[in-house]
Amino acid sequence: MNRSAIMIAVGMLAGSLYAQDAAGLVADVKNSYNGVKRNILEAAEEMPEDGYSFTPGPGSRSFGGWVGHVADAQANSCGGINGAPKQLGAAQMTSKADLLAALKTSFEMCDQAYEGTTAENYLSGVQSFRGQTPRIASLYGNFGHDQECYGSMAVYIRAKSLVPPSTARQGQGRGKGKGK
């Protein structure tokens, strides 16, 4: 076997290993997003209408404010990944129905962004509030922001004597908690 053939084989092997790593990274961010998406949607649906105006103290964002914030942030972030950042105006909405509709619209935009990400394009540049960033970085940024927001929303749910969705599922084979 000549050196050229060996170098070509090594190059092909390295390329396929790189693609597997990229595919794993893309699968991980999609899986992570789907988990927090479920938590946020279930939390927004669980909180009763009168809980949407609940704040734990002066100067705090209301529960509905958190839902609106997630919707607007996702519309901007995932819209940027999709090539058209948007503002839904959800921060000004107050009714549960309007906020849930905006939240679902923002998740549709994010579904498109996450599903459109592949091992081939995950490093491509997309527009974000930081300027041009790699697509995968914007997706992980969106996921991380969603996690932070869900953490705050879960506290509001507990303050209303309800059980956050992620905790409720712990007694159903996920985690070690008892859930309700």
Where are these regions (language model features)?
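Sec/Tat signal peptide C-region and signal peptidase I cleavage site
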Residues: 15-19
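Cleaved targeting-peptide boundary
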Residues: 20-27
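Bacterial N-terminal signal peptides that target proteins for export
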Residues: 1-7
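Well-ordered alpha-helical scaffold segments within catalytic/enzyme domains
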Residues: 39, 43-44, 78, 109-114
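Short, contiguous alpha-helical
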Residues: 30-34, 38-41, 49-89, 128-180
